[in-house]
Amino acid sequence: MKFSLACLLALAGLQAALADPATCEKEAQFVKQELIGQPYTDAVANALQSNPIRVLHPGDMITMEYIASRLNIQVNENNEIISAHCA
């Protein structure tokens, strides 16, 4: 029983680590084509399948590690989407 639980937890972590970079690229294009100028809301976050998603606000300090499957959404001071890319 303990072994099964440990395996399930390990698989859950592995799924996040192996997220598909192609999904991120498709979603970045969708955001650029359909959501530029729209407010970033929970509904937007829930509609996107990329994992993880990082929202970048003006003046945010960010780490520079490259994660191909991570969707970065840049917003302005009014929380409106201005850009998206994978990294």
From Swiss-Prot:
Bilayer-crossing regions: none
Localization, UniProt: Secreted
GO CC annotations on file: extracellular region
InterPro entries linked to this entry: Prot_inh_I78
Signal peptide coordinates: 1-19
Domain of life: Eukaryota
Temperature-related properties: Stable to heat treatment. Retains 33% of activity when heated to 100 degrees Celsius for 10 minutes at pH 7.5.
Alphabetic keyword roster: Disulfide bond, Protease inhibitor, Secreted, Serine protease inhibitor, Signal
Positions of disulphide bridges: 24-86
Biological function: Elastase inhibitor. Non-competitive inhibitor of A.fumigatus elastase with a Ki of 1.6 nM. Inhibits the fibrinogenase and collagenase activities of A.fumigatus elastase. Inhibitor of A.flavus elastase and human leukocyte elastase, and weakly inhibits porcine pancreatic elastase. Does not inhibit elastase from P.aeruginosa or C.atrox venom.
Protein name as catalogued: Elastase inhibitor AFUEI
Species this protein is from: Aspergillus fumigatus (strain ATCC MYA-4609 / CBS 101355 / FGSC A1100 / Af293) (Neosartorya fumigata)
